[in-house]
């Protein structure tokens, strides 16, 4: 074993015109969450507990697309989703259609620990949350002024805004200047919210992963993306822990997170090789990114977009927070 390691993400694919202050806000939040996880890992907190702890922090801050600050549905409401997985015995929990639970990642954890099921959704998940006594808030708590403005403009453009920030061309040349939609005089993509995730391997070599999101801006009611789908947006095994972000439908088709573990197990690839392989061969024309840790203490961030909000740290003192390639 190579010691503990942790990685966090706040979405893949970033507008090259993103203002410096927005970049700095994202870096500060990722740094704060990394440090929270590092302190816990140094105190021998388990991988699964660290994943939940860090994602709760991300859900509480409105900067990214999870918990407070989640993307809005076509009706202006929030329907959140999250999943968490413990690689030790491949235990998992997931939730979708969450409208009043302050921290969806903790409800996903309770589904794993306190229910006979792996996945609960909509009214059933909300009923379970109340029986478990989790913190409940009004749906309005999750709605921010920025997202209200984004939804209005998305409706005017008759479009759905994806949870990545650049047009499908995926290069700096296809920057926000190509978008006709603006808010406050700036390209709409500057305000686009992003999915969050965390992966951890603890000092015992146990891997865990979690992902949380509000989904797509102006999405249809009832839409479910990759984030709560075990094997697509989230996966953990005895080999690794993986959390994905980007074009949800492409990630679902690729079962991207599970594939990292599969090629490690069946092809004998190391973590870097496995991440490179799935990013290159499994996404077709989709754009996505992922963070991953291995049971050997390795940490890798991979993406085929121009950037990804990300941060990682290892027990030997390495720490990095970055956005661009």
UniProtKB/Swiss-Prot annotation:
The active site is at 195 (nucleophile). The keyword Protease applies. Substrate binds at residues 223-226, 245-248. GO terms for molecular function: asparaginase activity; beta-aspartyl-peptidase activity. Its EC number is 3.4.19.5. It is an enzyme of class 3 (hydrolase). One of its GO terms (biological process) is proteolysis. The record marks 194-195 as: Cleavage. Keywords: Autocatalytic cleavage, Hydrolase, Protease. Gene3D superfamilies: (Glycosyl)asparaginase. InterPro entries: Ntn_hydrolases_N, Peptidase_T2. It catalyses: Cleavage of a beta-linked Asp residue from the N-terminus of a polypeptide. Cleaved into an alpha and beta chain by autocatalysis; this activates the enzyme. The N-terminal residue of the beta subunit is responsible for the nucleophile hydrolase activity. Heterotetramer of two alpha and two beta chains arranged as a dimer of alpha/beta heterodimers. Belongs to the Ntn-hydrolase family. Acts in asparagine catabolism and also in the final steps of protein degradation via hydrolysis of a range of isoaspartyl dipeptides. PANTHER family: ISOASPARTYL PEPTIDASE_L-ASPARAGINASE 2-RELATED (PTHR10188:SF13), L-ASPARAGINASE (PTHR10188). This is Probable isoaspartyl peptidase/L-asparaginase 2.
């Amino acid at each position: 074993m190579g010691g503990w390691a942790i990685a966090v993400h706040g979405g893949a694919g970033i507008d090259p015109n993103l203002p410096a202050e927005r970049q700095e806000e994202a870096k500060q939040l990722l740094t704060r969450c990394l440090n929270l996880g590092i302190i816990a890992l140094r105190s021998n907190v388990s991988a699964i507990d660290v994943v939940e702890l860090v994602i709760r922090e991300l859900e509480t801050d409105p900067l990214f697309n999870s918990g407070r600050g989640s993307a809005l549905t076509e009706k202006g409401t929030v329907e959140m989703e999250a999943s968490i997985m413990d690689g030790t015995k491949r235990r998992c929990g997931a939730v979708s259609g969450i409208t009043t639970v302050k921290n969806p990642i903790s409800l996903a954890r309770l589904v794993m620990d306190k229910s006979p099921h792996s996945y609960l959704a909509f009214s059933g998940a909300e009923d379970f949350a109340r029986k478990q006594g989790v913190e409940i808030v009004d749906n309005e708590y999750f709605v921010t002024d920025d997202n209200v403005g984004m939804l209005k403009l998305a409706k005017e453009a008759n479009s759905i805004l994806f949870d990545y920030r650049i047009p499908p061309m995926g290069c700096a040349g296809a920057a926000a200047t190509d978008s006709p939609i603006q808010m406050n005089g700036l390209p709409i993509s500057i305000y686009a919210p992003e999915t969050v995730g965390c992966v951890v391997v603890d000092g015992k070599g146990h891997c865990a992963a979690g992902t949380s999101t509000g989904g797509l801006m102006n999405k249809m009611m009832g839409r479910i993306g990759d984030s709560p789908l075990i094997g697509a947006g989230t996966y953990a095994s005895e080999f690794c822990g993986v959390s994905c972000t980007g074009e949800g439908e492409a990630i679902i088709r690729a079962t991207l997170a599970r594939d990292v573990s599969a090629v490690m197990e069946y092809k004998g690839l190391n973590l870097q090789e496995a991440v490179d392989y799935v990013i290159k061969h499994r996404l077709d024309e989709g754009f996505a990114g992922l963070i991953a840790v291995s049971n050997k203490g390795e940490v890798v961030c991979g993406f085929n977009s121009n950037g990804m909000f990300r941060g990682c740290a290892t027990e030997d003192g390495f720490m990095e927070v970055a956005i661009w390639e």
